[in-house]
Regions:
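Short solvent-exposed loop/turn micro-motifs enriched in small/polar/acidic residues
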Residues: 18-20, 68-69
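Bilobed periplasmic-binding protein-like "clamshell/Venus-flytrap" ligand-binding domains
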Residues: 21-27
Length: 216
């Protein structure tokens, strides 16, 4: 259906037929229409059921309560902000409900909107520059929070120099940037000192490979 769609409505119908896997599908046509749909057959459990844990398959109490109509799937069709994007980030709530999923942190999505929002005259060169952008809009905010909890009177000269570098950092990750190295080492040591003693070395190593750790 998607391959033979002749209109936005045809394409949307094709997307609605995808029960699994859950995908972010982008659409654009020569008429200026843009759209984004999240695919997948979504469902609801009874209140109190947490699908992140092992459920009771015998009682029926933990079974799926209902499957939702495709109209309840997260989407944006010709939005007022005139563009669509996805960085596999958490969509906004629908009917007051945030759909669970293995989403990525907001870093890329936040940077994408930061670049797209103020500009409307995009061309090939501008898009190419955005594709290779390596700036985090989240990391500098994290740095502010970290520094606010540091007793700077007890720091060595080298540590004070590191803080100065971080304070001046705008979030870029260029080849010769020193700040990203300091930042990532600080984050690693923070996580290590917080979690490794509870998780153990092996589980902590596994924990570092998940997206959960990026959202702390």
């Amino acid at each position: 259906t998607l391959s033979h769609a002749k209109s936005k409505a045809d394409f949307q119908k094709g997307v609605s037929l995808i029960a699994a896997p859950r995908l972010n599908v982008m659409y654009g046509d020569a008429k200026g229409n843009v759209a984004w749909w999240a695919t997948g057959k979504l469902y609801k459990h009874s209140p109190g059921v947490n699908p992140n844990f092992i459920l009771n398959g015998a009682s029926g109490k933990d079974d799926i309560k209902e499957y939702l109509d495709f109209s309840k799937n997260p989407s944006a069709v010709n939005p007022t902000w005139n563009y669509v994007y996805s960085a596999n980030n958490q969509p906004e709530a629908i009917d007051g409900f945030l759909y669970p999923g293995y989403y990525l942190p907001e870093d890329r999505a936040k940077r994408i909107t930061q670049l797209l929002k103020p500009k409307s005259n995009w061309d090939k060169a501008a898009v190419g520059k955005m594709i290779f952008d390596n700036t985090s809009s989240v990391a500098p905010e994290v740095v502010k929070n970290l520094i606010s909890n540091v007793d700077q009177t007890s720091l060595s000269e080298n540590e004070k120099k590191a803080l100065t570098i971080l304070k001046d950092w705008k979030g870029s990750n260029n080849l010769n940037d020193v700040a990203p190295t300091i930042y990532n080492k600080w984050i690693f040591n923070y996580l290590k000192n917080t979690f490794e003693d509870e998780l153990g070395a092996e589980n902590f190593k596994q924990f570092l490979g998940t997206h959960i750790v990026k959202q702390l």
